[in-house]
Structures are given as C-alpha cells and as structure tokens.
Amino acid sequence: MRSISTLLFIISTFISLVSALQLAIPATTNPDPFCIRDFVQEEQMVVVNIKTNGNSGDGQRLDLRIVDSLGNEYRRKNDIAGSVKIGFTSHNSAAFDICFTNQLERKWSKNTNFVREIELDVESGAAARDWNAVQAAEKLKPVEVDLRRIEETTYEISGELQYLKAREERMRDTNESTNSRVKWFSILVITSLVGLGAWQVQYLRHYFKVKHII
C-alpha cells in the first residue's frame, strides 16, 4: 500500500510541477509590453501568481494586462507590487497573454538602471484547484485526492488532444479547399491564356491578309 501511495505522490507531483518563470523587466519612459503566452481550454480555471520586488512609489509602475487571442480581457491591474494572485475562467479555447509594462516615472527619466524582477507562476485546470479545500469538503483520503487530481489532469490532456485533432481536421479541410480553388483558378488562367493566344494568331493572320503581307 505504501508503494502505491508513493507512486501516486510521485506521479501527481510530476504532473502538477510547474517551474515559476523569473523575469526582469527594465523600466522605461515609453515601455513596450512584455508578454508570456499560454493556452487554455474553454471554461477552464486559471490562477496567476505574481511576486515582484520593489514597492509602489519607488520610481517604477508595473502594470498587468491579461487578454486572450480573441480580444477578451480578463484582468487589468496597475501599479502592482509584492504578491498578487489573480484567478479567472476562460471564455473560449484560445491562447492568452499575460503582459507587463514597467513605466519609469518622469522624475527618474535619467536613471536607466531601474528593473522590476518578477516571479510568475501560471496554473490552469486541475493544477489551479485548491485540493486541500476539496479534501476537507469531501472528506477524502490523501490517496483519493491524488487519484482525483490525476483523473482530472488525464481528462484535461484528453480534451486538449481532441481539440488538437479537431483543429488539424479543420486545417486539413481548409488546405484541401484552398488547393481545389488554386487548381481551378490555374485551369481558368491557362484556358484564358490559350484562348488569348489563339485570338491573337487569328487577328494577326487577318491583319496580314488585309495588308497583303501573306
């Protein structure tokens, strides 16, 4: 029984292990957004954990914006500092961007050495759930919690594979439709060129006959 529990713990730890990203964003007077992209399925819960150094009023203003590839904005937060936790549920299966801008205040415009360090951790689906709360609410044993977590993670992986398969089929259908259109367009162009060439030959023959050249 212990070996099974140990194996489940190792598997669940491996599945849920996500290394936090370490970012260093310099402060500028006209900053460009620095974005991290991830993919999420429809109606999937996402939790974004952010830890930054510095504090409000230190000459830098770190702003955050989370938006997906379809234009849906999930969060916008200005002048973040310290630890910030943001949760949201996706509207569609799409990629989403977590974008930071680090604005340098004007009074420090001559100082180009300001940098805001960020530790970013993004969890989605089963990894984003509070399993301690689930265990307490449903009175589950640790092994049962691990099994539930693995089950949900497996279901999510299966869903992602189904999405990728459906996407590949749509792309294949699009390619086949495009190839068919290109084929018929090529036939039309060739037919038009042949017809134009035949017309030019007839026109030149008529012209030369009228001019008594042939």
Swiss-Prot record:
Alphabetical UniProt keywords: Endoplasmic reticulum, ER-Golgi transport, Golgi apparatus, Membrane, Protein transport, Signal, Transmembrane, Transmembrane helix, Transport
Location in or out of the cell: Endoplasmic reticulum membrane; Golgi apparatus membrane
Protein origin, superkingdom: Eukaryota
Lumenal side: 21-183
Pfam families: EMP24_GP25L
One GO BP annotation of this record: vesicle-mediated transport
Chief location category: endoplasmic reticulum
Cellular component annotations (GO), alphabetically ordered: endoplasmic reticulum membrane; Golgi membrane
Domain called GOLD: residue spans: 33-124
Cysteine disulfide links: none
Bilayer topology term: Single-pass type I membrane protein
InterPro entries associated with the record: Emp24-like, GOLD_dom
Cytoplasmic side: 205-214
Transmembrane region(s): 184-204
UniProt signal peptide: 1-20
Keyword Protein transport: yes
Function: Constituent of COPII-coated endoplasmic reticulum-derived transport vesicles. Required for efficient transport of a subset of secretory proteins to the Golgi. Facilitates retrograde transport from the Golgi to the endoplasmic reticulum.
Database matches in PANTHER family: TRANSMEMBRANE EMP24 DOMAIN-CONTAINING PROTEIN (PTHR22811)
Family designation: Belongs to the EMP24/GP25L family.
Protein's name in the database: Endoplasmic reticulum vesicle protein 25
